[in-house]
């Protein structure tokens, strides 16, 4: 069954097909949205604030999943977020917009390291103190430990 295969691709169980929407966590709902988008075999996916409502550890899991899917399916993402640490984590190139206009554009790492615009600096300073890259490392370690046990 195609729906079950899509759920498995986003690290959910086929049994989840029989659940009601209110029975899912925020992270599970986000995975379902990803599975739905994959159903049409897209070349690119627009992710608009796709992890902003999730706690940071679940954000890291969903972002890792998106990265894995990108490699497996050769996907391109347009990633929209006010959290520049998320954009830096996901994107090779970054465009910072203010009032509907691009005020800064370039490699994500370079912009994050030395932003030219005051607005960009303000966004970076507003980044949550939890570092997504450290959380990704912890999630990877935890997954490795689980796999070692199994």
Show the residue positions of the predicted features:
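Conserved ABC ATPase "signature" region
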Residues: 1-15, 124-125
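Conserved ABC ATPase signature
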Residues: 20-24, 28
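Hydrophobic anchor residue at the start of the ABC signature
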Residues: 34, 62
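A short, proline-enriched helix->beta-strand linker immediately N-terminal to the Walker B motif
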Residues: 39-43
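A short, surface-exposed alpha-helical micro-motif characterized by mixed small hydrophobic
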Residues: 87-89
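ABC ATPase "signature
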Residues: 102-106, 114
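C-terminal boundary and immediately downstream tail of ABC-type ATPase nucleotide-binding domains
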Residues: 113-150
């Amino acid at each position: 069954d195609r729906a079950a295969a899509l759920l498995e691709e986003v690290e959910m169980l086929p049994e989840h097909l029989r659940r009601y929407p209110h029975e899912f966590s925020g992270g599970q709902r986000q995975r379902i949205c990803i599975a739905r988008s994959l159903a049409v075999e897209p070349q690119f996916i627009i992710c608009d604030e796709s992890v902003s409502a999730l706690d940071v550890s679940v954000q890291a899991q969903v972002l890792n999943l998106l990265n894995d899917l990108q490699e497996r399916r050769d996907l391109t993402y347009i990633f929209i977020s006010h959290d520049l640490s998320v954009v830096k984590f996901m994107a090779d190139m970054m465009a910072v917009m203010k009032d509907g206009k691009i005020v800064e554009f370039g490699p994500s790492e370079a912009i994050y390291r030395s932003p030219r615009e005051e607005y960009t600096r303000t966004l970076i300073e507003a980044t949550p103190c939890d570092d997504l890259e450290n959380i990704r490392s912890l999630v990877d370690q935890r997954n490795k430990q689980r796999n070692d046990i199994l």
